[in-house]
Amino acid sequence: NKYGTMALSVGLSLYLGWFVPLGVALYWIVSNLFAILQTAVLNRVIDPKKYVDYEALEASRKRLHEIEALQPDRHSAAAKENARREKADYKRFFSIENKHLVFYSEKSGFYKYFKDIIDYIVTHSNVAVHYVTNDPEDQIFEVAKRQPQIHPYYIGQKKTITLFMKMDADVVVMTTPDLDNYYLKRSYVRKDIEYVYVPHGMASQILTIHKGGCDNFDTAFCAGQHHMDELREMEALYGTRKKTLVPTGYCLLDDLIADYESQPHEAHTRPVVLIAPSWQQDNLLDTCIDELIESLLQADCRVVVRPHPEYVKRFKAQAAALKERWAHVDTERLSMEMDFTSNVTIFTADTVVTDWSGIAYEFSFATLKKTLYIDTPMKVSNPDFPQCKTPPFDLDIRKRIGVCLKPEEAGEAGATVRRMLAEAPQSEAELRRIREESVFNVGHAGEVGGRYLLKQLVARAQNAKE
């Protein structure tokens, strides 16, 4: 009977249609309940507290939450607009063939390390400068409006990973170390790209860069002889291939010197002391800042506290607490500076107090004034540095361009600053001599770097013709 068969078929289908989902649901419910029971039993047998540091785990969770809170809302109108820009710029970047020169920057603040080099290139050639940045608000977009040779692209950090994998250019210039060690890889498309590392500071390469951080670059610009010596020693230590080392100098220092010398300088009736620490663990803000401020105020100094931008961003509570603790002091004697866009405070200070921040070199070499160092625990990115025979520049230079105090000696800061200022006239000539010894091509770093890049591009063009 066809109707009976149809009814049986429909009935069986309905039965299975209900039975199978219910069976699967029952399976998952029972298996999950059993897994919970199994975990509870195992936790009683093997106590996880013996193997897991729950306090550290909770601290890491809080830290992760703080970092995530710093990220922009992906669903905001601005984020959606940036996503649209990124997609368009990514497509535009790869639509251009025969790119010769590419600069990569993580954020707007890194433009200052490239500025003089790029200025030389666009002034002395018609080479197009392709500038990739992870910062949608990078100043390069405004610069490019005035200079048509510069072609800027906003590419987010994640998309930069694939951009680097597919990179097609003759020369790539960047300040980011650890090329090919982490997420930024050498091109999978072209094997003949020359990758050039530009240091964003005069600090020691064997201290501040991870082991192997420069190994995968073809060329490294060097601020001073210490960079060349340290890089060569690391090559020998690790048995890596020799890079081309270019004695360029330090572009940012050149700009700071020019800016400082172009400004009028008035003597202060009350010495101005700028406290500008790093943001590493156990920096002077977290170890001896109150004793430091108290001592300087007692010595009748005007104190300006300028925390590192990363410290303010990551440790808002500590920065706010510091500000509140000293709110009772008149701002004519003590002020907290949270605007990091200007160098006016650096230029007008009579001395700088820091721990391991590179601002010391920039201040002392630009103004020819001594720095007061607080010897907080040193930040070491490369634990192998004791194996190097070359003494780290950061350790050697401190006592030459400044005076060092231990954190427990912070109460002596006021008297120390007064003594340093009394000796300032004799210190200027000595600091000028040390600057000339320590930094290559003072006043001409951008020219030297730009000339090298143009020379490499010309050589490649000639080889291509042949």
PLM features: residue spans?
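Short acidic-hydrophobic, aromatic-tinged amphipathic segments that line or gate anion-handling sites
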Residues: 151-157, 248, 334-338, 401-411
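Active-site and donor-binding regions of nucleotide-sugar-utilizing enzymes
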Residues: 102-257
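C-terminal alpha-helical cap of glycosyltransferases
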Residues: 442-466
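Catalytic binding pocket for nucleotide-activated donors in carbohydrate/polymer assembly enzymes
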Residues: 242, 351, 356-438
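Hydrophobic alpha-helical transmembrane segments and adjacent short intramembrane/lumenal linkers
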Residues: 1-51
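Cytosolic, positively charged, low-complexity intrinsically disordered regions immediately flanking transmembrane
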Residues: 38-87
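Donor nucleotide-activated moiety binding/catalytic core segment of transferases
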Residues: 155-158, 317-361, 366
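Conserved catalytic-core segment of nucleotide-activated headgroup transferases in glycan assembly
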Residues: 109-126, 251-325, 407-410, 421-422, ...
